[in-house]
């Protein structure tokens, strides 16, 4: 009996040792399983923003030219200042124009007097014709002279009106409200009516236009995707945002105004025009900007962070996923385009897949890994294209 007890004790001790070793091996194996960050894919929609180059264009431009000739005797604005519609910009010497008006008024008075005498003569001839004291020829001559005199009155009145207008044109005014540019003439300069060179340019900059260029390929792609339902366009006006040359986002949001129906043969692009509020004058004509045009919402999209997509030697896109057994699997995928810092995946992955986005250097296909949630799980749904 004692002999059996002596044999049983060592066997129990060995069993306990083996159990402890198994537990320690399991702990070591768990400790050696690499941790990876994963993103669980779910379909959603994203706002597609087309990034288009463009330049700012004044909302209105008025090149000021004189409508009468004469000597500039005064400039009534400060270059670079705001001018209102109707403000006086230049004063042309009115004396010659006033003399022309006075002469026209004198000619009108003379024409009126001649017409009055012709009317009296005609009336007298008409009365005498009834009693046959004058001939029909004398009557006809009197009527013709009256008609000519009345026509001369009409011409003289028109001359007075034109001279009055010319005198008003001596005060050169701004037809729009805007910012004045550099004056091309000084006091004492001789100007002529409708000359080729403008005196000054006035530009309205609030609001302001931005002319954008879009390639025909992108234009056709957008139309196809809208027609197929892949993109749901924004109802009403299309919002547009601007990035300035210094990299900063312009504070005001604009809207798309129109799309040019023709294609520029030299560049193969179409022109889009957006309009922006410019209350502080931050946008100046000719500035280069980058516009973000909201094309609409792309439906049922799988977005994969760029960290989760690599390209093999053949240039094909691949991704590592963690299957239901926590085994790393390699998938060949189709990443149609990058939107911001994410790829739009059209095949090779499906909703619910866990894509590995961090810890990639510690794993390879076929091994087990332990998943941890990635901070990129909730990716932005507004992206550039």
From Swiss-Prot:
GO terms for biological process: bile acid and bile salt transport; response to antibiotic; response to toxic substance; xenobiotic transport. A lipid is attached at residue 21 (S-diacylglycerol cysteine). GO terms for cellular component: plasma membrane. A lipid is attached at residue 21 (N-palmitoyl cysteine). Residues 1-20 form the signal peptide. Keywords: Antibiotic resistance, Cell inner membrane, Cell membrane, Lipoprotein, Membrane, Palmitate, Signal, Transport. Homotrimer. Part of the tripartite efflux system MdtEF-TolC, which is composed of an inner membrane transporter, MdtF, a membrane fusion protein, MdtE, and an outer membrane component, TolC. The complex forms a large protein conduit and can translocate molecules across both the inner and outer membranes. Belongs to the membrane fusion protein (MFP) (TC 8.A.1) family. This is Multidrug resistance protein MdtE. It comes from Escherichia coli (strain K12).
